[in-house]
């Protein structure tokens, strides 16, 4: 399975790391935004080199010659995790000024699965309208909202819950959580 992963500058880097760790064995294409590089320094015990090592292919966010910027490059899904509100707003407005937003535009125009994982809260009416617009256009909006029916004992358990749901959405089997 070919999966494009964008890490934007929102809080929630542990979700991205755990997601990539669970995609081993799949063909992954990673883009880390400039803002995400800064957030990684604040939020993660992992460095950028480790995160990049989890992906099969890595691209800079300004590399418009990357294959994922073209509709002729076939991939199964794109996941932006975490997805900043700025990135959601750009995608909703059709702004493709970074590789992440360009690959998202490709996903939309080619009718490929696009999943955005916002972590922000509270949300403004504008944020909600942008997410609604994306959802109406086929994007899966999967907020990083852990469920508590699994009785998490740690932050890692809560991260596992969200990542398990994202993996389910892209069709990657996992046993990160106890299922009903």
From Swiss-Prot:
This is Flavin prenyltransferase UbiX. Keywords: Flavoprotein, FMN, Prenyltransferase, Transferase. Dimethylallyl phosphate binds at residues 149, 165. It comes from the Archaea. FMN binds at residues 9-11, 33, 84-87, 119. It catalyses: dimethylallyl phosphate + FMNH2 = prenylated FMNH2 + phosphate. Flavin prenyltransferase that catalyzes the synthesis of the prenylated FMN cofactor (prenyl-FMN) for 4-hydroxy-3-polyprenylbenzoic acid decarboxylase UbiD. The prenyltransferase is metal-independent and links a dimethylallyl moiety from dimethylallyl monophosphate (DMAP) to the flavin N5 and C6 atoms of FMN. Disulfide bonds: none annotated. GO terms for molecular function: flavin prenyltransferase activity. Pfam families: Flavoprotein. Its EC number is 2.5.1.129. The keyword Flavoprotein applies. InterPro entries: Flavin_trans-like, Flavoprotein, UbiX-like. The lineage of its organism: Archaea, Methanobacteriati, Thermoplasmatota, Thermoplasmata, Thermoplasmatales. It comes from Thermoplasma acidophilum (strain ATCC 25905 / DSM 1728 / JCM 9062 / NBRC 15155 / AMRC-C165). It is an enzyme of class 2 (transferase). Belongs to the UbiX/PAD1 family.
